[in-house]
């Protein structure tokens, strides 16, 4: 595709999520990554520059720090907004809620991540569930990993005409691996003190027809999250039919327990 016809994208926040998003954009034939924005001048920003990405600073003071670290800076967030069609905001929770006002003022379409509230965009997104409803919108929110998993799993059953309602218990990791030296828990479990936990209602922002209730507990590990489900079916179904329903999803991998 000709460069002038590609969607120009800037990623704000080059952390773990932002890094993956930016790398994915570089692999698309209908998009071009015009830059990444961050506030720190650590190894992550250095890696972005080394891979040829244009680096912008979130603030003027952040730009000063980056230049002192020897990084080439192409301006601030305001400069990045001059050459963009879509801003993907991967900044930490609650920061994007402030940034969206700037995006709206500049009339730039934007995507935020699951740490923000549904009200930040008025639309929450999981591709397999509600792709069509996102077309033509100026903004959406890609929900968290937990919520995405819930929607993918239950949508597969719903699409097969099997799902009546679901009740789930989530075992969540204590902290992200790259922050395990800063916070987390040890030798204990911390249950969320409200039922439902926030993940179930969050899934309903994507699909309001889901009858889902979740409970969650945080454990002393950083490997990942684990979900257990009790599902009431619309009708009797064989094990093979349930597995086929999950296989119908392009984003669910079935792994035999003997290989796990």
Could you tell me what each predicted segment is?
Residues 2-177:
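N-terminal Rossmann-like NAD(P) cofactor-binding subdomain of oxidoreductases
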Residues 6-23, 155-258:
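Active-site-lining helix/loop region of Rossmann-like oxidoreductase modules
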Residues 86, 91, 104-105, 248-254, ...:
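Compositionally biased, intrinsically disordered low-complexity regions enriched
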